[in-house]
Amino acid sequence: DRIMRLRERFGSDRIIALLGNHDEWVVNGSSTISNNSVYARIEEWEDESDDDEYINWLSSLPLYYVEGNTIFVHAGIDEEAGDMWEWETSEDVFTSKYPAETGKIEGLDMKVVAGHVGTAEISGDKFFHDIYFDGESHYYIDGTVLDSGVIPVLMVDTENDKYYQVTDSGKQLIEPYEE
């Protein structure tokens, strides 16, 4: 609801929302807003009377967004497709790709920013819930918020190819994750 209102207030060109796997389940009818574990934790969505409004809104969300040399996506892209990723990636990969991939994407000079898989799992550190950068092509931003209470905030300067983690104390350039 908040994201919908933010888009109404500031415009869909400034507030970008992407379709994710839970949203896709609601749109295709395999789940409802009130019984979907992500939405069920939000009291205001326990009333199914507004479901049509949310379903229509979710149906309008794009699968990815590109700004500069950065692809923003819920889960990932078909990396074997290289620079043909936009045409070769299936909808289920955009929304449900698993496991997360790391390393250089051959044939594609772009970065991918994705969520879906928790950074604790990607890093192999159950206590890591910050932004994960593999040092090559991937930034993962799923801090497993329902377990950790952490919502990592990423600021991207696409003109200068700089990626920052934003916290209450300011912004910090993201360095590759080190074990």
List the predicted regions and their residue ranges.
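Short, well-ordered beta-strand micro-motif
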Residues: 66, 72-74, 153-157
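Histidine-centered divalent metal-coordination motifs
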Residues: 21-22, 74, 113-118
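Acidic, His/Gly-rich catalytic cores of divalent-metal-dependent hydrolytic chemistry
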Residues: 102-179
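Active-site-proximal beta-strand elements of phosphoester/diester hydrolases
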Residues: 70-76, 139-141
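Short catalytic/ligand-binding loop motif for oxyanion handling, primarily in non-cytosolic enzymes
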Residues: 24-28, 73-75, 79-82, 121-123, ...
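Active-site neighborhood of divalent metal-dependent phosphoester bond hydrolases
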Residues: 1-68, 79, 96-103
